[in-house]
């Protein structure tokens, strides 16, 4: 049986990357929450 997780950096960044987060109001809220928590990584990209 094929595993469900087939990693792809491009798909990962397009859905969860910094520019994807910045593109929507809710995405910017996600970044704001992560900044407030002082997360070392805001998004999977970078």
Swiss-Prot record:
Residues 26-46 are annotated as: Disordered. GO terms for biological process: translation. GO terms for molecular function: structural constituent of ribosome. Pfam families: Ribosomal_L34. The keyword Nucleotide-binding does not apply. It comes from the Bacteria. Transmembrane segments: none annotated. GO terms for cellular component: ribonucleoprotein complex; ribosome. Residues 31-40 have a biased composition (Basic residues). Keywords: Ribonucleoprotein, Ribosomal protein. Belongs to the bacterial ribosomal protein bL34 family. This is Large ribosomal subunit protein bL34.
